[in-house]
Amino acid sequence: MAAFSYGLYHSSRKTLSGVKTSVTNDWLDNATHKALFNSEYEARTFLGTLDAAFMIAYATGLFFWGWLGDRLNPKYVIATGMVGSGVMLTLFGAFPKWFDFYNAAYYVLTYLLFGLMQACGWPSEIAIMANWFGKANRGFVMGVWASCQPLGNVFGSFFTSWILPFGYENAFFMNGLLMLIGAFVVMISIDPKPKETQYSQLHNEESGERSHAVEGEPIKILDAILLPGVLAYCLCNACLKLVNYAFFFWLPLYLTEAYHWEETTADQLSIWYDIGGIIGSVVGGYISDKLGCRAPLIVAMLICSIGSLFVYAHIGAHMIWNAFFMTVVGVTVSGPYNLIVGTISIDLGSQPILAANAQAMSTVSGLLDGTGSAGSAIGQILVPIMQNSLGWESVFYLFMLLNTLAICCIMKRCVMDLKPWLSSISSSPELSPLLNDSPHEE
């Protein structure tokens, strides 16, 4: 059910991405109201501003909700975010159309609040998954589970394209309604931790022997940043999430403008990027379990992403080839992103230095995804500016540069992971999933 709930989170985010052409046309040319913008350039720039506003609020919210998720029942945090997201999505996209109320400040405010509510989900979802699953096959388990993000995108793309002929405002309303239904399902079906863990904690509390070694104290954000490996992956994710979310926000519009395809066709074709993300997440998690380390695999995938981005930028309007290389880009961009925010979040939040402190997980995952969202916020402003000034090709070169920087951020971690892995080929000792107890690690 955790995968179901976060899939709905992602599905609701996909709404604006799938209707940008319709929304732009409504802002520019409508008999019922004065045009909100004077040119398509202004409208597109404002769309980038909205995406950036969402990511800024989302990044800020991740730090807060991650901190709060270690102090409250994570199920309640998830449900609160779903209710708030459903309400804000309807107010943002449906309310202006229904009541002919078009105001730029109103759009920014409601989308900021939507981003803040969306941030409730991920840290608490990760905390729940960490309670239910241990180290065994963590890469594969979390790879499968983290695929709920691209699966949610796929569902959101299809659902939005299906509703779009009835009016883009109804796409916002129906996705908002799904979030409200999902919140109810979460409240009645999710257990934050296994029953035996709850019984054990209750027994310890009744006998006055509460185990601080298991629960621990909630960790401070600054202390979380200084944990081994956290800062490197935060910086890596700031670059990688910018690229991943640029595809998330702009891919349907790119397909519509670059190849003059219908908006519904572009929405449906864009799912191949998310299908690639599912493949990369699941297969990457499985391979990383077999390798006994994560960073070398992520570096290899990111190196491949640079070539796949270059090819995709020049692939042309042939739908089959476009879909194929879009899938390859999804494998090499969305795949490692899912591994970082999923599997590696748990690895970093449960490393030996924390002494099994279960109260650190949500904070660490919120920090990791929050810094990624901060980087992504910058990207959503850069994309329309670069596209308007230099064309779409320049945007893809920006993506290649950012993925190169992402590689640099974790190269030290990669080298450290490779040393014991290479030595293990001959000796075959038992390996930890990600983190080694090396004293020189930073």
Predicted segments, located by residue:
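Extracytoplasmic gate region of multi-pass secondary transporters
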Residues: K14-T21, L227-G284, Y337-G342, I378-Q380
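Extracellular/periplasmic helix-loop-helix junction of adjacent transmembrane segments
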Residues: K20-A59
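Cytoplasmic membrane-interface "Motif A"-like loop-to-helix N-cap segments
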Residues: R71-M82, D289-I303
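Helix-loop-helix hairpin linking two adjacent transmembrane segments in secondary transporters
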Residues: W145-P194
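C-terminal ends and interior cores of transmembrane alpha-helices
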Residues: V83-F101, I303-A317
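Symmetry-related core transmembrane helices of the 12-TM Major Facilitator Superfamily/SLC fold
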Residues: N170-I188, S394-R413
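Cytoplasmic helix-loop-helix junction between adjacent transmembrane helices
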Residues: T110-Q149
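Hydrophobic core of transmembrane alpha-helices in multi-pass small-molecule transporters
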Residues: M88, D100-C120, I320-S350
